[in-house]
Amino acid sequence: MNESDTRLKLIDPAIMESWDRNTQVFTEYFFTSGEIVVRGSMVTRKDKKKADYLLMYAPGIPIAIVEAKDTEHTVDAGLQQGMGYAQLLDIPFAYSSNGKGFVEHDFLTGKERTLAMDEFPAPAELWTRYSKAKGLEHPYSQEIVTAPYYQEHGGNHPRYYQCIAINRTLEAIARGKNRILLVMATGTGKTFTAFQIVHRLRQTTEVRKVLYLADRNILVDQTIDGDFKPLKRVTTKVVGRKLDSAYEVYFSLYQQLVGENGEEIFREFDSEFFDLIIVDECHRGSAAADSAWRKVLEYFNCAIQIGMTATPKETEEVSNITYFGEPVYTYSLKQGIEDGFLAPYKVIRPKLNVDIYGYRTEEGTVDDRGEALPKRVFEKQDFDSEIVIKERYEEVAKRITQFLKETDRYSKTIVFCVDIEHAENMRRALVNENADIVRDHPTYIMKITGDDREGKAQLDNFIDPDEKYPTIVTTSKLLTTGVNCKTCKVVVLDNKFGEHGMTEFKQIIGRGTRICEDYDKLYFTILDFRDASRLFADPEFDGEPVVVFEPNPGDPIADPGPGGNGGSPVPPPPPIVDPPVLPPDDPSSHVKYHVHGADVYVVSEMVQYYSSDGLLVTESLK
């Protein structure tokens, strides 16, 4: 009997004896989207992963995997495959069957046993075993871990990793833990995950009042109008010092609770007012021992506190893990790319001569503003923070424009700069390189920084996939985190990564990792002018690029595509530690020189792919 008949005639009846076909049994269950593979201009997807049977105790609470084989196979022939799926899906029981019996692997005990076809466990039996092993038998715990998910006909359903994050969070709370850390890569739906956690907890007697903390208005507004929209009737945004107790879900900027001069406004509210606090992008300071935001969390210490971030910060001064504890779940950038939920990327590295050899100034000369120049060689990390070389940022703008002309001039592009002045210089240089479009469409290129009201007013248009303009934006820090631009196809790195380089690097890479197939966005390209891609070799980084390309002067800047015979592996370069970065926008901290007349050009080209063993394989050299 073949596998289809075995399932239909033998395995299905055995399972359906005690499991509901419509709500608990899911056959041919696909749980990944298939990794996106990019080779030159060719884009394909690998096969999706699927389980023969996924069994759920309740919607969103998977409990068992069953892999089926035909009657010619042994009863345990599918067990290891099922175990692999169960581990990935965080499921406690895996089964294999050939229609003549079942073999069970219990991840809770590590033991295996064989079962007759009429001995397949019922949902209540598996749930009881699971609850006992996890210490969730108490009625209080059961109320929390079985609270229903929000389900809307035609709406979003949690992906497998979101279910894991949600279920592990509720289980931790059910066991009495009140500080919880979730680490999920940018673009994997942290706010949707947070919404489901809030919704489920609000179905219990444990949680009524919820505070959602963020550090930017755009993040708050996106969340209220997006994933949290089903709760809008009971939701309010904190304005000033007012906290209307008639609402149940409160969104607030950190700044609304802590004044500019350190006033502890939050103390006007009862310390037990909130039952649950969600800390969005918690790496951005809430865990610092001397942070004002830490004071907010410690004041409301009776509340359950959940920190969410793509990049937990661990330094001598700041530790998310010390405050929240080890993450209850981590879903990495690498895993998101492998599952096909995040976009892979190419890297193009134009090497500028001044970046390689430095820029020498002589004592006794002055810059464009009359400042006396020192005798020294300025290096790459000094450009645009210590010294501004007009020809350098103009060459960068020229290469960005060249790439867009060779690919698509209307690809949404973010250019990350050293500081606000650099962002303005880059905007002007890009305008001059693209005057043919800017003449008719002045918002084709915009600077969006914290000090620019006009630029920030265009942020919603940049994010909107149906709005063509702005197409290119220059920024320093404002767009580093949280801003959801699904159609961003180009990320330009002309900034610096200092003390917390890896955290910021991951956040910036995350600006492009969202997939938007309706707008032909399956991968994105990084133009790296600062050697930031050295961080790919850092052990902390977990999502390698699919290609690295270094163009020669005069050559097309777009990736030429596959070629050659594969070449040989080249070990990745060692990480380079930047010197401390001075605050770029504080004019009193240092003198910034401005010069022009330099000869700036691109000097090299290399195309490299990352192999499956993590080495760089050289495809071509020029």
Task: Please annotate each region the language model reported.
Residues 267-307:
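SF2 helicase catalytic motif II
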Residues 1-209, 214, 218-233, 245-249, ...:
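ATP-dependent helicase/translocase motor core
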Residues 96, 250-253, 304-309, 473-474:
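Structural recognition of the conserved hydrophobic beta-strand(s) that form the central parallel beta-sheet
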Residues 72-74, 220, 257, 284-286, ...:
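Catalytic P-loop NTPase motifs of RecA-like helicase/translocase cores
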